């Protein structure tokens, strides 16, 4: 049995990780999700399994593997494997509604949100919240399943033509539109439950088309990336979110509401990749920290690194 298997869907996003694993001499196997088949009674594929599933995979494969992966991770955890970003954090990644409830549990503010499972309920939800509103699919990625509506007439037309987003799980969120101060969103990256770094994406507050890594911003030159230091209160809060969700590696995003200066949290991403050009932006390569973490987990799992 290999020490490590990386369960993944998007090889381009994982290229820096794969290169680092080879550079450090890991005994590992890539495990593509697209055509994956598993036997629930069989042993796990490795002592340690690293889940790298992206929610945006629903855009790249009609017969997506989201719930297949959830079942596989649960089976492997039950069979004794150490699964990094296992079934518990994946269940949060699979539900924006659960993410918002988690943020509130920690005492964080979010955009005001109502959750339903029928398209016909959306207009009444929007009227309750007040325009403009954002309608979101419960499961999405890279901005998929997100639309802004500025009036009741516009929304009613979209509902009547079934043009409003709704999740692959039939759950939909209607959310207050929050104007991001200076058009900036901030992504906090965590590793092993600890704050690792944060980046500001300037210009991202006007778009929904963000993916798990700023490497995707190559075609969005209006968005710039820089390292930032959030307040200690926010660092502590995201650590608590990570702890409650069982998140080993991932990102949590927030923005500052330009109307009142309040930090509002809106996204939990267990597939958040590290910043591109890390030495230029951060002054260090977080893949080194990740490799150290993986070595430690392999050792704890009883394998040889």
Where are these regions (language model features)?
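Short hydrophobic segments within beta-strands
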Residues: 6-7, 191
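Conserved N-proximal alpha/beta basic substrate-recognition cap immediately N-terminal to
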Residues: 9-112
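Active-site nucleotide/adenylate-binding loops and adjacent lid/helix of ATP-dependent enzymes
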Residues: 5, 76-79, 87-183, 232, ...
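Glycine-rich phosphate/pyrophosphate-binding beta-alpha loops
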Residues: 142, 269-281
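Protein kinase-like catalytic core scaffold
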Residues: 133, 196-197, 250, 264-266
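A long amphipathic alpha-helix within ATP-dependent nucleotide-binding catalytic cores
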Residues: 209-263, 286-303
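Phosphate-binding site of ATP-dependent enzymes
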Residues: 148-244
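Short glycine-rich anion-binding loops that position phosphate/pyrophosphate groups of nucleotides
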Residues: 54-57, 139-140, 271
């Amino acid at each position: 049995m290999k020490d490590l298997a990386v369960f993944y869907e998007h090889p381009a996003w994982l290229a820096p990780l794969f290169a680092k694993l080879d550079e450090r001499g890991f005994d590992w196997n890539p495990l593509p999700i697209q055509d994956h088949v598993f036997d629930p009674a069989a042993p796990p594929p490795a002592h340690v399994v690293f889940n790298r599933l992206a929610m945006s995979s629903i855009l790249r494969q009609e017969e997506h593997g989201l719930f297949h992966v959830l079942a596989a991770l649960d089976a492997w955890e039950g069979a004794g494997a150490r699964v990094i970003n296992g079934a518990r954090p994946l269940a949060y990644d699979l539900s924006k509604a659960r993410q918002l409830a988690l943020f509130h549990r920690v005492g964080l503010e979010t955009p005001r949100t109502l959750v339903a499972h029928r398209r016909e309920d959306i207009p009444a939800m929007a009227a309750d919240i007040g325009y403009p509103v954002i309608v979101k699919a419960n499961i999405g990625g890279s901005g998929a399943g997100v639309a802004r509506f500025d009036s009741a007439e516009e929304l009613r037309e979209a509902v009547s033509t079934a043009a409003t987003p709704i999740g692959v799980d039939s759950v939909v969120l209607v959310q207050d539109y929050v104007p991001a101060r200076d058009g900036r969103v901030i992504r906090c990256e965590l590793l092993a439950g600890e704050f690792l770094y944060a980046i500001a994406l300037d210009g991202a507050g006007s778009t929904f088309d963000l993916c798990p890594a700023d490497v995707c911003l190559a075609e969005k030159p209006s968005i710039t990336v820089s390292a930032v230091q959030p307040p200690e209160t926010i660092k502590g809060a995201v650590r608590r979110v990570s702890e409650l969700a069982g998140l080993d590696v991932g990102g949590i995003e927030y923005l500052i509401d330009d109307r009142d200066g309040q930090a509002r949290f809106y996204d939990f991403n267990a597939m958040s990749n590290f910043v591109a050009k890390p030495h230029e932006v951060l002054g260090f390569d977080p893949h080194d920290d990740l490799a150290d973490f993986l070595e430690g987990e392999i050792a704890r799992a009883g394998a040889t690194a």
